[in-house]
Amino acid sequence: MVSVKPIPAEVVENREECERTIVLRLRPERPIRWEPGQFLMLGISGVDEKPMAFSGGDDREFELTIEIVGPFTERCADLEPGDVVWVRGPYGKPFEVRGSRAVVVAGGTGVAPLVPLVERLRRARVHVTSVLGGPHADRLPRKDDLEKLSDELYVTTEDGSEGRKGFPTDVLEELVEKECPDVVYACGPEGMLVRVAEIAREHDVPCQVSVVRYVKCGEGICGSCALGKGLLVCRDGPVFWTEELEGTEFGGVRRDVTGKPE
């Protein structure tokens, strides 16, 4: 059930995950039933409200993986156990589990919705090969979790300080030939997702991506997350099969807080 009205949630834990990234664990006033790939709106009184992907836990206590990039997320980093925030949701469509072999591709904090997805896939006895990429060794969020949950984990860094030097898509090209996966899942920078979609299409592998766009209302009203062709990230996504995104603004036009093209 979606909570349209914000409800209070207590901060249970706020831990530093890696450089400029935290994991916030919250206990809402009442359980929120969510699925991997869905998101909520996180509000801090007197500050702002932002969309955040569910990143672990369960209905009664869940985690959010948050990159520190501005005033709101800096305030998130200052939260302490016992503090109260506001949440509403869940919103959006989740990932779909299919097949017996999957490749999961994460770029930076795009890993957030993929951690619970990998956990769900393993419970469904799906063989999971994960790829996690970041700029350098200190910016690989949830690496330990992915390593524990996945059958195999490949790491890439742009500077070569850990794992393979390069990008997650460099590894993906090899994996789709080696692993012959039934499906590819991905979340991260949109440029990366475009390349993931291209590789999956070239090898005729179904692919779901979680698209990150500016989301203001979460309820399909404001239009700030419009993708064209009548699609809204908050209502029709954030998870899409890549064929749904053909002919849209995905990989091209971006929109500002008002929904106007930038």
Swiss-Prot record:
HAMAP family: DHODB_Fe_S_bind. GO terms for biological process: 'de novo' UMP biosynthetic process. This is Probable dihydroorotate dehydrogenase B (NAD(+)), electron transfer subunit. Residues 4-97 form the FAD-binding FR-type domain. Keywords: 2Fe-2S, Electron transport, FAD, Flavoprotein, Iron, Iron-sulfur, Metal-binding, Pyrimidine biosynthesis, Transport. Its cofactor is [2Fe-2S] cluster; FAD. Heterotetramer of 2 PyrK and 2 PyrD type B subunits. Pathway: Pyrimidine metabolism; UMP biosynthesis via de novo pathway; orotate from (S)-dihydroorotate (NAD(+) route): step 1/1. It comes from the Archaea. Binds 1 [2Fe-2S] cluster per subunit. One of its GO terms (molecular function) is 2 iron, 2 sulfur cluster binding. Responsible for channeling the electrons from the oxidation of dihydroorotate from the FMN redox center in the PyrD type B subunit to the ultimate electron acceptor NAD(+). The lineage of its organism: Archaea, Methanobacteriati, Methanobacteriota, Methanomada group, Methanopyri. InterPro entries: Cyt_c3_hydrogenase_gsu (IPR012165), Dihydroorotate_DH_Fe-S-bd (IPR019480), Dihydroorotate_DHASE_ETsu (IPR023455), FAD-bd_FR_type (IPR017927), FNR_nucleotide-bd (IPR039261), OxRdtase_FAD/NAD-bd (IPR001433), PyrK_electron_transfer (IPR050353), Riboflavin_synthase-like_b-brl (IPR017938). Belongs to the PyrK family. [2Fe-2S] cluster binds at C217, C222, C225, C234.
